[in-house]
Amino acid sequence: MLTLNTRINSADKVSAQLVLPYESRENSRLRTALSSGEEVAIFIPRGTVLRHNDLLMGDDGRVVQIVAARESTYRITCANPHDLLRCAFHLGNRHTQTQVGEGFLRIARDNVLKEMLEGLGATVIEEDAQFEPEAGAYGSGGHHHHGESSQGHAHGPLAPIPVHQKIHRPSDIPSR
């Protein structure tokens, strides 16, 4: 089985594609299959989120391109930027993973959130689309500490996320 364990910035040749929904692209340990059907294991640093067109190199030197799968989403638009900002605020207040586009927001389908957004005056359209939510203020690109105390270390205006913080996903709601 091919093991993909190194993220690279560019490659002369891409050997295969791996189509994954966002939820799978959040996993740093995953067993799945390439578009060709070949089984692969992803073993990358914890906390890494794979994005559309990312490249991973396998233990045999082959390069695999990540492709964001089309998923069941809602595309949210509003009559004006102020109303769209209000919708973004309420989604963020509920820790909902949200993709921010030019004049629209996109979230995974969730009927409760759809009703809330429509109540705020938004137009909510179901669509199958690639889902690329924002990494957030605490997402990749930040830094971490190896065993050192954070006392006396300023993080600027952003506070660390509490350990018990919950991110809302539609799959978190138990079915009846």
Swiss-Prot record:
GO molecular function: nickel cation binding; unfolded protein binding
Domain of life: Bacteria
One Gene Ontology CC term in the entry: cytoplasm
InterPro entries for this protein: UreE, UreE_C_dom, UreE_N, UreE_N_sf
Keyword Chaperone assigned: yes
Localization (cell): Cytoplasm
Pfam families membership: UreE_C, UreE_N
Keywords for this protein: Chaperone, Cytoplasm, Nickel, Nickel insertion
Gene Ontology BP terms: protein folding; protein-containing complex assembly; urea metabolic process
Gene3D superfamilies: Urease metallochaperone UreE, N-terminal domain, UreE, C-terminal domain
Disordered, as annotated region: 134-176
Family statement: Belongs to the UreE family.
Role according to the record: Involved in urease metallocenter assembly. Binds nickel. Probably functions as a nickel donor during metallocenter assembly.
Name of the protein: Urease accessory protein UreE
Originating species: Nitrosospira multiformis (strain ATCC 25196 / NCIMB 11849 / C 71)
Gene behind this protein: ureE
